[in-house]
Swiss-Prot record:
Taxonomic lineage of the native organism: Archaea, Methanobacteriati, Methanobacteriota, Thermococci, Thermococcales
Organism: Pyrococcus abyssi (strain GE5 / Orsay)
Catalytic activity of the protein: pyruvate + ATP + H2O = phosphoenolpyruvate + AMP + phosphate + 2 H(+)
Gene it is expressed from: ppsA
Top-level taxon of the source organism: Archaea
Listed name of the protein: Probable phosphoenolpyruvate synthase
Catalytic-site annotation from UniProt: H441, C756
Length: 819
């Protein structure tokens, strides 16, 4: 049967996120890599889209489904103004959402519940239902049965909404049996796109509700005898030579949800020596519901298996090593440490991989940090998003209007953070959120700021009150009642040990290709410098300028130019000082119009259909020279203090004249390019790559590839467009040919080459760039060490290949001489 709405795992790759979401794409990737993944298929995002756009309902249908609820609140308003003829479900959904104040939790709960009820109550179109039934039948027949147990999981597809950000927001259904039950669970997955939490998150992050879709993964259920999670790099010590395995009895939900304390095993890569075992008391386990034959229940291990199983080692030593080796295989495939869910099936005794995602929380921490604190009371558990210990007075806030309540050293507690809360986050001793995952805003910013954070606690804003005192363990994801002195003392010792000059770190790898770091905020300069990076390949201006809280041009027009200059100079100096004498490349302002428009005073910003192709970068800088002039004045102030390690980097350059005019503005404030500062450009526009020789002749010292934009512009692909995002590929031959051409020409003229796009943090891309002869690679702070290792390995390979080639040539010459 030719399917329109179904994709089998075998048909999918990791690039298919827009089609089947992160979970689905990853399962397809692993299946095709030969990893033992239970087979299955995905009901594509197109099916959800077809459902909401083609199922039409009338006023009477809505009233029949909702009953008394139809006469209350927002839905009553929608019904009163709706036309009499039936219309697509999507229009009903958007009418309800557009009338919803997401900050009114009661209204948000009520309105999203109405949407979910409508989705669950309506019949699935026959064209979709028939395909699901047929695919389920085919899957069952693979195992010689009419029906098999499956898991049905939600998989969000909007590429710019990280999968982890949806943790606990969309649904997962286990031990589903029968085609009709599968169809029901797929609809329930669709409905879970409209939970209050997921809706609030999208609204606060500025995502368009109408463009977020959901895929449903239908996968053969592993009848787990034992299961768990493994990290292919020790997330506590950041040791990439160790694998950490957590294991418990039954289905893996107990481990993932934190309902059980699992066994923990530490395995050394390569030698496969089991370095450590911690056998836990496993009080509960999740199993298939024995009464209904469907779904799951949580039972006590002592009652279900027997008292002796509570403290029994879950995995045999042979199984520990088997799991660890499988983890290493998956890590090698992806080129990055992985967080993997695994299970042993009691029916065939085999190991299966259920899910894998990149580890995002690796940090340098001390082993002391995770010692048990027996006397302390744990009052909340969540995801350890940013390691370390923080303690202080709790301040609960619900939106950015309350950030002034958070004082220096407070513990910030909120539903979820957003960019407007960054000023408060900087002041906080620790951060706790109800929602979010390891790639949520709270997690990313906390890691960059070096502030301990626990996210996804679900109930922090309910359990904690302003004025409470807590201690936050951002490594283990725990929140303790009160100030735990032993943990706070350990933190002080750690800070003392980490202070500049307090200890001599292990000698870093020395590489011919420099490894630099990207810095978004001056506040993280010291931490970024501590990575051992060879300089800053990208210091972003956006955060410093946007943090003034007002449109910068309006700020200048109000006579506050000096204030802006001081603010910028302060930030630039902080980074230049932390890295001196290592180079710091400052990129001039590159914020698109939509970011400016959201600021106070930004009402006159133009409405652009695609701001990334619009008025930004050097284009805007030359049109509004007062802003560029303020940036150059700030740099001059820092240079006059003796910091001669600064470079100016112009974004979105496409013509030599832009370089010439920018230099004129710099000279007008007394800043001399090439003498006071190094002068460079971003290579983001294909035009810049093609005419690189002309740009060099205008006078530049360095170039840096902005691969995010370069890839989009070269391939004519909008990464935010789910229909074409799967075609986005930074390693596309056309992109690599442009990069290779620029590097070749720059070497001829002695111009330094670098990269500061997201690709700089990708091990695969780093290997390619080393072979192309790039001079430096700038990575995100948490990727610097990994990229340095990758660079060192690739350079050694190149030297070995060259030596072997020379040896073979000498042997051939010797043979010719002898014979």
């Amino acid at each position: 049967m030719a399917y329109r709405f179904i994709k089998w795992f075998e048909e999918l790759r990791k690039e298919d996120v827009p089609l089947v979401g992160g979970k689905g794409a990853n399962l397809g990737e692993m299946t095709n890599a030969g990893i033992p993944v239970p087979p299955g298929f995905c009901v594509t995002a197109e099916a959800y889209k077809y459902f909401v756009e083609n199922v039409k309902i009338s006023k009477e249908d809505v009233k029949r489904i909702l009953g008394e609820k139809a006469n209350k609140g927002t839905i009553a308003e929608v019904l009163a103004q709706a036309p009499d003829e039936p219309r697509p479900l999507q229009e009903w959904i958007m009418d309800i959402i557009n009338r919803t104040n997401v900050d009114d939790s009661k209204q948000l709960q009520e309105n999203t519940a109405v949407i979910r009820e409508l989705i669950k109550s309506l019949d699935m179109p026959a064209e979709i239902a028939d395909e699901i039934k047929q695919a389920y039948k085919e899957l069952s027949q693979r195992f010689g049965k009419d029906e098999i147990y499956v898991a049905v999981r939600s998989s969000a597809t909007a590429e710019d909404l990280p999968e982890a950000s949806f943790a606990g927001q969309q649904e997962t259904y286990l031990d589903v049996l029968g085609a009709d039950d599968v169809i029901d669970k797929v609809k329930r997955c669709w409905a879970s796109l409209w939970t209050a939490r997921a809706t609030f998150y999208r609204a606060k992050q500025g995502f368009d509700h109408s463009k977020v879709y959901l895929s449903a993964v239908v996968q053969k259920m592993v009848n787990s005898e034992k299961s768990g999670v493994m990290f292919t790099a020790n997330p506590v010590t950041n040791n990439r030579n160790e694998i950490m395995i957590n294991a418990s009895w039954g289905l893996g939900e107990a481990v993932v949800s934190g309902a059980v304390t699992p066994d923990e095993y530490i395995v050394e890569k390569g030698t496969w020596k089991i370095k450590e075992k911690v056998i836990a008391k496993k009080e509960v386990m999740v199993i298939r519901n024995p009464e209904t034959g469907k779904g799951t229940v949580t039972v006590k291990v002592a009652e279900y298996l027997g008292p002796e199983w509570v403290e029994k080692q879950v995995l045999t030593d042979e199984q520990i090593i088997e799991v660890a080796k499988m983890g290493q295989k998956i890590e090698e495939h992806y080129g990055w440490p992985q967080d993997i869910e695994w299970a042993y099936d009691k029916d065939d005794g085999k190991l299966y991989i259920v899910q894998s995602r990149p580890v995002t929380t690796l940090k340098e921490t001390t082993t002391e940090e995770v010692e048990e604190v027996e006397e302390a009371e744990v009052i909340l558990k969540g995801l350890g998003a940013s390691p370390g210990i923080g303690a202080g007075r709790v301040v609960v806030i619900f939106d950015a209007s309350e950030i002034d309540k958070v004082k220096e050293g407070d513990v910030l507690v909120t539903t979820m953070t957003n960019p407007d809360m960054v000023p408060a986050m900087k002041r906080a001793a620790a951060i706790i959120t109800d929602e979010g995952g390891r790639t949520s805003h709270a997690a990313i910013v906390s890691r960059e700021l070096g502030i301990p954070a626990v996210v996804g606690t679900k109930e922090a804003t309910k359990k904690l009150k302003t004025g409470d005192y807590v201690t936050v363990d951002g490594t283990r994801g725990l929140v303790y009642k009160g100030i735990v002195k032993s943990l706070v003392e350990k933190k002080k010792k750690e800070e003392a040990a980490a202070a500049p000059g307090a200890a001599v770190a292990a000698a870093p790898l020395v590489t011919g290709t420099l490894v630099k770091v990207n810095v978004s905020m001056p506040e993280v300069a010291e931490r970024a410098a501590a990575t051992g990076a060879d300089g800053v390949g990208l210091l972003r201006a956006e955060h410093m300028i946007l943090s003034i809280g007002q449109h910068p041009v309006k700020f200048i027009k109000e006579g506050k130019e000096e204030e802006l200059v001081e603010k910028l100079a302060e930030g630039i100096e902080k980074v230049a000082a932390a890295f001196y004498p290592r180079p710091v490349w400052y990129r001039t302002l590159d914020a698109p119009t939509n970011e400016f428009r959201e600021m106070p005073g930004g009402e006159d910003e133009p409405e652009e259909r695609n701001p990334m192709l619009g008025w930004r970068g050097i284009r805007r800088g030359l049109d509004q020279p007062e802003l560029l002039r303020a940036e150059f004045k700030a740099i001059k102030k820092v240079v006059e203090k003796g910091y001669n390690n600064i470079g100016v980097m112009l974004p979105l350059v496409s013509h030599p004249e832009q370089i010439r005019k920018a230099k004129e503005i710099a000279r007008s404030v007394g800043l001399e390019p090439h003498k006071d500062v190094a002068w460079g450009i971003m290579i983001e526009v294909p035009a810049a790559a093609i005419i690189i020789e002309d740009l060099i002749k205008e006078g530049i010292d360095f170039v840096s590839f902005g691969t995010n934009d370069l890839t989009q512009y070269t391939l004519a692909i909008d990464r935010d467009n789910e229909r074409v995002a799967k075609l986005y590929d930074e390693t596309h031959p056309a992109v690599l040919k442009l990069i290779k051409h620029v590097i070749k020409v720059c070497k001829r003229y002695g111009v330094e080459t670098s990269i500061c796009g997201q690709a700089g943090s990708d091990p695969k891309m780093a290997r390619i760039l080393v072979r192309l002869g790039i001079d430096s690679i700038s990575a995100n702070p948490d990727a610097v060490q990994l990229i340095r290792q990758v660079v060192a390995q690739e350079e050694r390979k190149l030297m070995l290949e060259a030596a072997r080639k020379r040896l073979f040539e000498e042997e051939e010459e010797e043979e010719e001489f002898l014979f």
